[in-house]
């Protein structure tokens, strides 16, 4: 059994380079919600150094709220913004002798696309326009995955180690009680259950089916590196390999 382990990079976290040694895929901020040309280039170089798959992490142009506030943009505007961000990172990766492998939207863009077919379509079309070989990463069982499949993209269904789930398979919104899984032990148990059994227990107690192709690790917490090490150890004990391919 194998699973992809991904982390967001280029968002100002101090653990980026060390975290890359523990994951198989990196989602690099593309300058709208965080980062700039220099951080994008540095993140690409670190990913190549660690032999980690390079992914674009486009978001809304909303630095003030770190791309986490909902926005309602015309489809054409969103399409252009995603093409712009993904295309820029693709050029930087190729300039360093690397390759852009996947695209994972950030924050509110990710969460809105998970529920909004029109928004999900705009993202999928933008990704396909840049390179139809790119993998689209989205919340398991979401509109993002369905849009990717509609438009002929390879998709990767993602689950979260440290986030709580609603009974419909969506994430509990940040700021709501219980949104974050605070205990490392609980987060590891939840992750193993999602990977091995294809299900997760929602905040209200129901079991929800999920397909865990990739697991997101958040690198911005105070114990991010320690948790990543512990999760890798748990995978090793269970015979689960970490790989982006």
From Swiss-Prot:
It is an enzyme of class 3 (hydrolase). One of its GO terms (biological process) is carbohydrate metabolic process. Keywords: ATP-binding, Hydrolase, Nucleotide-binding. InterPro entries: Glyco_hydro/deAcase_b/a-brl (IPR011330), LamB/YcsF/PxpA-like (IPR005501). The keyword Hydrolase applies. GO terms for molecular function: 5-oxoprolinase (ATP-hydrolyzing) activity; ATP binding. It catalyses: 5-oxo-L-proline + ATP + 2 H2O = L-glutamate + ADP + phosphate + H(+). Pfam families: LamB_YcsF (PF03746). Its EC number is 3.5.2.9. Forms a complex composed of PxpA, PxpB and PxpC. Catalyzes the cleavage of 5-oxoproline to form L-glutamate coupled to the hydrolysis of ATP to ADP and inorganic phosphate. Belongs to the LamB/PxpA family. This is 5-oxoprolinase subunit A.
């Amino acid at each position: 059994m194998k699973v992809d382990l991904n982390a967001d990079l280029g968002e100002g976290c101090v653990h980026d380079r060390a975290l890359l040694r523990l994951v198989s895929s990196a989602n690099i901020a593309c300058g709208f919600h965080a980062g700039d040309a220099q951080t994008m280039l540095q993140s690409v170089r670190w990913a190549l150094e660690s032999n980690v798959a390079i992914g674009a992490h486009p978001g809304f142009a909303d630095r003030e709220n770190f791309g986490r506030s909902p926005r309602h943009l015309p489809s054409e505007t969103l399409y252009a913004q995603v093409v712009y961000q993904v295309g820029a990172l693709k050029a930087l990766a190729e300039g360093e002798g690397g390759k852009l492998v996947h695209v994972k939207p950030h924050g509110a863009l990710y969460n809105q696309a998970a529920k909004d077919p029109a928004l999900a379509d705009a993202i999928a079309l933008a990704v396909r326009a840049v390179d139809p070989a790119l993998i689209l990463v989205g919340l398991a069982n979401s509109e993002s995955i369905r849009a990717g499949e509609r438009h002929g993209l390879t998709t990767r269904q993602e689950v979260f180690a440290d986030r709580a789930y609603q009974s419909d398979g969506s994430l509990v919104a940040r700021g709501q009680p219980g949104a974050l899984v605070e205990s490392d032990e609980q987060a590891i148990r939840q992750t193993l259950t999602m990977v091995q059994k294809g299900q997760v227990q929602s905040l209200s107690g129901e079991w929800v089916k999920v397909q865990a192709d990739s697991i997101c690790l958040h690198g911005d917490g105070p114990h991010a590196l320690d948790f990543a090490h512990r999760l890798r150890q748990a995978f090793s004990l269970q015979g689960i390999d970490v790989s982006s391919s």
